């Protein structure tokens, strides 16, 4: 399989997002990289499903709560930016204060 660097990045985010999803399902609080991967993967999948940038900006704030992450993680992630592929091209999705 010959993947571009961009495709490798997306695959890594998706894989880390799956690990985070499984840990959440077991009740394990997510650390920084897991929280980033979980939200980023969800945003990438949402773009692939046809959601708009505005919808994803809101959706990104509903994925995790303070109770689901380790102490101090919400303050470490003031925003998340993901370059996602939409039906009409690639766009930057920015989610401010993703963990409430």
From Swiss-Prot:
GO terms for cellular component: cytoplasm. SUPFAM superfamilies: Urease, gamma-subunit. The keyword DNA repair does not apply. It is found in: Cytoplasm. Pathway: Nitrogen metabolism; urea degradation; CO(2) and NH(3) from urea (urease route): step 1/1. Keywords: Cytoplasm, Hydrolase. NCBIfam families: PRK13241.1, urease_gam. This is Urease subunit gamma. The lineage of its organism: Bacteria, Pseudomonadati, Pseudomonadota, Gammaproteobacteria, Pseudomonadales.
């Amino acid at each position: 399989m010959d993947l571009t660097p961009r495709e490798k990045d997306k695959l890594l985010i998706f894989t880390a997002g799956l690990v985070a999803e499984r840990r959440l399902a077991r009740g394990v609080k997510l650390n920084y990289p897991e929280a980033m991967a979980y939200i980023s993967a969800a945003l990438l999948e949402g773009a692939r499903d046809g959601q708009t940038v505005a919808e994803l900006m809101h959706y990104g704030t509903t994925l995790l709560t303070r109770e689901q992450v380790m102490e101090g993680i919400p303050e470490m992630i003031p925003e998340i930016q993901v370059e996602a592929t939409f039906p009409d091209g690639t766009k930057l999705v920015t989610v401010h204060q993703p963990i409430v």
